[in-house]
Amino acid sequence: MRSTHTLGPGPHLGGHEINSYREINSYRDVRPANLVAFARYVTKFTFCSRERQCATHVAPQVGGDTHALVALTGRLRKNASYTSANGSGLSGPSEVLRHRTNRRDGVVGMTEDMDRTAEGARLRDADVLGVPWRRFGPYLSERQWGTVREDYSQNGDAWNYFTHDQARSRTYRWGEDGIAGISDDRQFLCVALALWNGKDPILKERMFGLTNSEGNHGEDVKEYYFYVDNTPTHSYMRYLYKYPQAAYPYDDLVSTNRKRSKTEFEYELINTGVFDEDRYFDVEVEYAKADPEDILMAVTVHNRGPEAAEIHVLPTVWYRNTWWDGLTERPTLESDQSGRILAKHHVLGDWVVTASEGATWLFTENETNAARLFGGNNLTPFVKDGIHDFVVDGRSDAVNPAGIGTKAAAHHTLIVPAGQSQRVIVRLQRVDVAVDVAVAATESLGANFDDVLELRRQEADQFYAALTPAELSADSASVMRQALAGMLWSKQFYHFDVDLWLQEHQAHPLRAPTRDLRNRQWFHMLNGDIISMPDKWEYPWYAAWDLAFHCVPLSMVDPAFTRNQIELMLSDVYLHPNGQIPAYEWNFGDVNPPVHAWATLFAYHAAPHEHGGSDIDFLRNAFKKLLLNFTWWVNRKDPSGRNLFEGGFLGLDNIGVFDRSAPLPTGGQLEQADGTAWMALFSQNMLELAIELATVDPSYEDLALKFVQHFFQIAGAMDRVGETPDEMWDEEDGFFYDVLRLPDGTATRLRIRSMVGLIPLCAVAVISPETLEQFPSLTARVRSYLERNRDLLVNLADPQRPGVNGHRILSVLNEEKLRRVLNRMLDEERFLSPHGVRSLSRSHLDEPYVFTVEDHRYEVGYLPAESDTGMFGGNSNWRGPVWFPINLLIIRALLQYYKYYGDSFTIECPTGSGHEMTLFEVAKDLADRLISIFLRNEDGDRPVYGGTEKFQQDPHWRDLVSFHEYFHGDNGAGVGASHQTGWTGTVARLIQLFGEATPDDALHAPGGFLAYHPHQSAAASPT
């Protein structure tokens, strides 16, 4: 098993390498000469009590006394310290790190203000020294049931093979889930919250939602929870869950939604009345790390109702069942005489768990209750749902009286008065028998618990203050911070050994070639990493093209993790040997847009410092794998060899008149405007990568020329010389369309005015005059190629015509086409909504597109909210709503065009308004429209919440923001998955960028402007 965050080397003491605080005790031959190295290592940890405990134990062994060692570490700590808001001196990185002046030695991508914060120092310690600050994090899924990984059915019906009702009793095979949960980065040890209000039929251990067949618009979580705060090392995290005091209406939600048609609204939890009179609890969960292996958990329960109410609060600790096959040692959770739990694991080591005074520890096993589910015999007398049976059903025999197991919960029964709050606390600490037991005994829930918690809150404030433009309103700053918190909470441990899974299904293609099963051709895959999820309930699996967009907001807070995500998708245990990037677990072989080269460029340019060796290594390694992916596209998705690409749905689900992933009802093939434009953009991105690499290795100039040629051949094919009826550009309409090429060789354009026709706008790159001067040989070869292939350039932007500041442009659209496409896009009766660019023109509301095949009528009409069909599961819709990823690429393209045309190009925005804007102003206008979805408007309402009054007016709801999957095409209300902070989290970058950037910045910024930091120093600028 591979881990995403590996622990780097520590100092060498007496010939040994110390990799963790807990290992200090094991070294007996440390020499006095290495005392300074040891002391510097100690400064990586947080509290002086730890420092003294360590010094007391080790000093005699290194030939020094305790006072000398404490004095030395204290002196180094003083030199390395930074002061928090309350004036407390905190341990930071070592003296060596704190006094570095070369930006190349810092954390990749950190701004100088971020670098000065306590959280910035922790990031540096993690990335440079390997201090395991990221080892524990919010890596627990919010839904493991109903996933492909857990599906062992004969028919591939994942939703019904492993249900929510079974989840409390049935052991998972590949992961775990929970409420407000954390785990280590290999998910051996998990911590989460369970609740019971005394009325629910089951213990609330996981979020409830409808399966795909139960919801009138597909799967849908039916809970209210919010990712309020998080830092990139997860030193501070905050999560809020709204728990009704009445019995949770499980049956009502299922039965009512099943009765509703696809044209009706969904029946939501708030519609059931369980929040009437504010009869609910706000359950706030906070985590803070005193050091990487000392984690504090505080659960504060606020009774918002008019009467006192009872609630059972059960912080729960358990091990993922890795011992099911009998080949792995079973870990243990065992109560000691002081009422704490000692957690022992053969890989993770020993930990101690301490809970609030008065808690009763309940123990059981993370084993399936076969008797309940299947009428069989249980392997152990105590099973996974034993704590549920004890709390809800009062069965004292359901938990182990011996105080031992693999799952344990600290049971607190609270009576919370109306309008008041009560708190439960837990502490999880790594144990070293000789050193840390004494520390745990004195510190576990001591006075410093609240000090640590408050300190980490303040440090989180400082970190986000360093990211936030000073000019932002408080509301904008809050939305930006919540978006980034959502990105960080959406990390998940994703475990899937496809080779083993196929063997277990007796469907491995090399061993059982006759059985058909999804993902049979992906048996090379071995996933066991921390990955950014689109939504940890609705989409608790990675989606390749989503992940590329996740890199935009993630790079703002954790550039190293961002690069890790790109490297994962391009690694040999993800990327198919043929070069295809895996799509998602329902079908790894589906085809998503090729945006990973763009994401690689973004991650590179987002690093505000001089690019050093590690950056070039990152680019070089990514480029090699992206070259494989590009070749796969050229060989597999250009069937005619005419540089006109297909690819299927390409992430846009139901946008076409036909299911673009299925065989066409007409026969023939579909030449896709978006697929072809994606490849034009891919070529441009690979060209830019090759040029960057050619600065250190001239051999990449040949590859740069290759991608120049690819771009012009692809772009030229989209609009060939002369007016022909089978090309994608429609001169009469001034728009791009898919072309249906029939078996008899005839062709017709599918005149749907959709996002498909806007994606060619995004295929634009600007080349600086410095690049032309730096590579004279390449420039001459490109010029020679263009002179020999003049026909390719007739309908494209002239690549040899200098623009502002001598820039050259590579674009599918020349100036005339750009104006015509923008006129449509900026028309409020067509694409431009108050909250961004729609995925389908509103003109199709009154004029749906109809295509008839024999007697069957296919139709595409404007649907601003949910889909009215079951295509692609029925829970997404690209026929009208606003989606962030394409809007982001449009904004990026407008900024590129502005860099070339400057202020000389203006256009009416909105179309027909008489108001002329530069392309920078258009980009900012689009960004403002997108951002406005989440901000309070002049009426004090947030468009994202539509007409839901409680979310708009209630002081305990109105400032909590959900980042939905997509948004109503007319009013901006959130639709689809409610926590798809993933690509919707890109709003954070839009808020930050346009909160401080100027047109002059856009004209002169090196690299990609979307990744630009306007106020970084010259030495810190991307090149």
Predicted regions located by residue number:
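Compositionally biased, intrinsically disordered low-complexity segments enriched in Pro/Arg/Gln/His
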Residues: 3-5, 22, 28, 50
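Short hydrophobic alpha-helical segments enriched in small aliphatic residues
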Residues: 6, 13, 17, 30, ...
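Residue-identity detector for glycine
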Residues: 8-10, 14-15, 63-64, 74, ...
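Charged/polar low-complexity intrinsically disordered segments
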Residues: 17, 23, 61, 77-78, ...
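Acidic, mature catalytic/reactive cores of soluble proteins
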Residues: 55, 86, 95, 100-106, ...
